[in-house]
């Protein structure tokens, strides 16, 4: 029977913390710590797309992964012009995984780059990077919503990842470096909130493995990922961000003072935008004989044009 160095049971993951806004200059960021593995994840938004997507009306999510020189026991040379092959492969894995979280058309013609830099490596760096990058991505999207650059969130799925393996003939989850270096079977699992697999990377390092062992690893991984997703939600909630986007509420007005006032009132529950920010800038003929009637005409017109629930300015009548 395997005895793990830190006393964990085979099915138990390491302690996890996720600190949002770790890099204040980034559009979104977090520091994720899984045991002694520590990874900074940042998200940067650019208002353009790669050449192969220009004019197609959709955005792009990509990633870069690197390890700081002192992140392991021996100094790792920094990437130069020729990037480390392992780092390139992991960068592609992170990018593929996080694109599964986003409706690229709803993102619009902009690029979000997720940079994952390993401060300290003790196994599971790529899976920690994916889990942390999801949080950084949500933070960046929240900023775009707050700035009125997006009217609805393009986030469609929650993504997290964990490592599993067979060590001393025992299936276990969330391997540290010592366990990973002698694992007989090594696997990385990426899943969404529905329990669907986004990516599986698995190999028999020291021997082949059975269907029963594979099933045990998948079950352990799914349980571990569910716990990681709760950590993601908790860290985002602490900074008043949420994976499920706040609905958009349009105000039938261009009065910025009124918009700010309603954002202050409803901002915890709705993304409040002006009718111009929602794409409506046409004159409205107010033909009713009462204040409430004209407010209704204005709100109904804006709601019909934008397809979004609309709040009449001073009357606070709501139309959907």
Which stretches of residues belong to each language-model region?
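Short, conserved beta-strand segments within well-ordered enzyme catalytic domains
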Residues: 31-33, 40-42, 62-64, 250, ...
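Polyanion-binding surfaces on beta-sheet-dominated domains and ring/shell assemblies
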Residues: 1-244
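Active-site flanking residues adjacent to catalytic metal/cofactor-binding acidic residues
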Residues: 116, 312-313
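Alpha-helical protein-protein interaction elements
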Residues: 14, 57-59, 201, 258, ...
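Conserved small/polar residues in nucleotide/adenosyl-binding loops
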Residues: 319-320
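Secondary-structure boundary/capping signal
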Residues: 106, 240, 270-271, 310
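N-terminal polybasic phosphate/anion-binding patch
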Residues: 245-309
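Catalytic metal-binding/acid-base residues of hydrolase active sites
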Residues: 316
């Amino acid at each position: 029977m395997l005895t793990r160095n830190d006393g964990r049971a085979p099915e138990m993951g390491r302690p996890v913390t996720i600190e949002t806004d770790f890099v204040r200059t980034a559009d979104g960021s977090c520091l994720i710590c899984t045991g002694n593995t520590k990874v900074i994840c940042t998200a940067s938004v650019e208002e353009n797309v790669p050449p192969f997507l220009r004019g197609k009306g959709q955005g792009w999510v990509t990633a870069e992964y690197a390890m700081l020189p002192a992140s392991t026991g021996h100094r790792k040379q920094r990437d130069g012009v020729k990037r480390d092959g392992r780092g390139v492969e992991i960068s592609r894995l992170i990018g593929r995984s996080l694109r599964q979280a986003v409706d690229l058309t709803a993102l619009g013609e902009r690029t979000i780059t997720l940079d994952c830099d390993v401060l300290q490596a003790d196994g599971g760096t790529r899976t920690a990077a994916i889990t942390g990058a999801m949080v950084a991505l949500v933070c960046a999207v929240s900023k775009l919503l707050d700035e009125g650059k997006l009217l609805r969130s393009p986030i469609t799925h929650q993504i997290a990842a964990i490592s599993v393996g067979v060590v001393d003939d025992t299936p276990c989850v969330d391997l540290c470096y010592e366990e990973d270096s002698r694992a007989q079977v090594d696997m990385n699992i990426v899943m969404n909130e529905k329990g669907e697999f986004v990516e599986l990377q698995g190999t028999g390092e020291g021997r082949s493995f059975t269907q029963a062992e594979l099933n045990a690893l998948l079950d352990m991984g799914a349980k571990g990922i569910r716990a990681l997703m709760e950590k993601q939600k908790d860290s985002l909630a602490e900074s008043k961000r949420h994976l499920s986007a706040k609905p958009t509420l349009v105000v039938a007005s261009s009065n910025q003072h009124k918009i700010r006032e309603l954002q202050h009132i409803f901002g915890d529950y709705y993304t409040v935008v002006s009718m111009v920010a929602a794409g409506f800038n046409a004159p409205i003929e107010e033909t009713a004989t009462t204040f409430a009637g004209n407010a209704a005409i204005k709100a109904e017109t804006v709601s019909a044009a934008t397809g979004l629930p609309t709040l009449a300015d001073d009357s606070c009548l709501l139309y959907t």
